[in-house]
Amino acid sequence: MAAKIRRDDEVIVLTGKDKGKRGKVKNVLSSGKVIIEGINLVKKHQKPVPALNQPGGIVEKEAAIQVSNVAIFNAATGKADRVGFRFEDGKKVRFFKSNSETIK
């Protein structure tokens, strides 16, 4: 099945501590999760790695969110939207369900 949320899509978080925040998808994991820029930040305790000249400390990084907890953001309507698929000129493309506009 084709992915409804893809890398570089702008999405909005539907549930959780970051509800309502928007961000760009950095990575889509095969486990049904996505990593979004600046969303779901967690503190990771990093050990120093002298061989790579990396210092230790507490680092903030993005954690994965379930893909069901985010929705693609439709800039035309300014709201979260659902994604559908259709064929145009022999190619399968994604479109917004609210206004039938093709997603780039």
From Swiss-Prot:
UniProt xrefs under InterPro entries: KOW, Rib_uL2_dom2, Ribosomal_uL24, Ribosomal_uL24_CS, Ribosomal_uL24_KOW, Translation_prot_SH3-like_sf
Organism whose genome encodes this protein: Shigella flexneri
Cellular component annotations (GO), alphabetically ordered: cytosol; ribonucleoprotein complex; ribosome
Membrane-spanning ranges: none
Any one GO MF annotation of this record: rRNA binding
Keyword Phosphoprotein belongs to the record: no
Gene: rplX
Superkingdom of the source species: Bacteria
SMART domains recorded: KOW
Subunit structure: Part of the 50S ribosomal subunit.
Gene3D superfamilies with a match to the protein in the record: 2.30.30.30
Protein name per its UniProtKB record: Large ribosomal subunit protein uL24
Purpose: One of two assembly initiator proteins, it binds directly to the 5'-end of the 23S rRNA, where it nucleates assembly of the 50S subunit. One of the proteins that surrounds the polypeptide exit tunnel on the outside of the subunit.
Similarity comment: family membership: Belongs to the universal ribosomal protein uL24 family.
Cross-referenced Pfam families: KOW, ribosomal_L24
Cited CDD domains: KOW_RPL26 (cd06089)
Keywords: Ribonucleoprotein, Ribosomal protein, RNA-binding, rRNA-binding
GO BP terms: translation
Keyword RNA-binding: yes
